Amino acid sequence: MAAKKGVRIIITLECTECRTNTDKRSPGVSRYTTSKNRRNTTGRMEIKKFCPHCNTHTIHKEIK
């Protein structure tokens, strides 16, 4: 039998400024993983988190 699919899903958040910013501290893109409730948050998440590559707090958006 298949396991029942839960309400919470694991998502990946990616820095929006790492793609376009050329004056970064180090090369690369910052990514975080977290979970969200599928029923309460139907749209894409946007959270302000610390990016070690940009060395500042930036907006991280949900990616596929």
From Swiss-Prot:
One of its GO terms (cellular component) is ribonucleoprotein complex. Keywords: Ribonucleoprotein, Ribosomal protein. Gene3D superfamilies: Ribosomal protein L33. GO terms for molecular function: structural constituent of ribosome. Transmembrane segments: none annotated. GO terms for biological process: translation. InterPro entries: Ribosomal_bL33 (IPR001705), Ribosomal_bL33_CS (IPR018264), Ribosomal_bL33_sf (IPR038584), Ribosomal_zn-bd (IPR011332). Belongs to the bacterial ribosomal protein bL33 family. This is Large ribosomal subunit protein bL33. The gene is rpmG.
